[in-house]
C-alpha cells in the first residue's frame, strides 16, 4: 500500500449542472505532482447514487456527458499514480426515493441517517433488501470495465434494522423479529452476506484486488470483521468529529492485527465537503507525521469541485506535508511496533456494538 494517498470525494447532487466541464488531464496531473501523491481514490458512485462513467448497472449523473472516471484513471496511471475506486455502498439517495422499502428502519419506522424525507440528509440502505444485488452489479461492472487498483466501499457495517425485509427474514430464521439480541444477531448475518457477496463481485473480474469496507471506525475486539478487508483505512479527521485522540488509539489497536493500514485525515478546516476550508499547513504536517509515527500510511481527504477542476491551493497544502513524508518513506515501510505496554480497550469489553450504536461507547 502506498504512503501518500488522497481520497477524492465527489458527492454531487443531480441539481448541479456542468459536471466535469473543467476537467483537464494536464491540470489533474499537475495537481497530483504538486501534492506529491502516489495514489488517489476516485469515484464510480457517490452518496447521491449517480455514476461518474457510462453505466448499465447504474445511471450516469444527468449533467455529466463523458467518462470522467476513465479520464481520471488514465491521467493518474500515466504518471504512475494508483487509482482505487470508490462506491457508496450504504447510501444511495436516488434509490432511497425510488425504493423507500429498501431503507434501514428503526423500531418506530423512522429512517437513518435522516429520520424521514422531510428532513434534509441521506437515508441509509438496508443490505437485507434487493438493494444488495443492485450494488453487487455496480461493483462487478466497475471491476470489469476499469483498471482499478482497489475497491473502497463506504458506509458499511453491522446495522440493526426493522424494515419489513429484515422482519420477514428473522421470522424465517426462527428469530424474534423485535427482540434486541435477535435483531443484532440477524444484523451480523446480513453484514456477513454483504461482505461475502461484495468480495465475490470483486473477484469475478479482479481476483485478490484490495478491498476495504469503511464504517468510519475500526471496531476494537472484532478481528472477525477485520478479515473482510485486505487492509484498513482509519478515517479520523481530528476536527471533523473524531478528535485528536481517536487516531493514535485506533492505530495502536491495528498494530496487532497483522494487516497494512493507513490514517485518513482531511485537508478541511472542519470536516468532509468543506470546499472553502483549509487547515493550516502545520496541522496537516502534524497529522501526516502522526500517521507515520504510528506505523501507518496516509490518506488526505479532499472534495473535487463539480467542475472537475482540481484546487491547486489544496494540493500545495498537501504537498507541504507529503514532500516531507516522501523523504522518509524508505525508513517507514515494513515497520513493527516496539511498544511493550498493552492497552485495554473499553470498546472490546462493552459487548455487542454496531455502527448504529456507536454513541453508546
Where are these regions (language model features)?
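Carbohydrate-binding surfaces of carbohydrate-active enzymes
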Residues: 2, 10, 28-31, 39, ...
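Short, polar loop/linker segments at the starts of domains and inter-domain junctions
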Residues: 17-25, 358-360
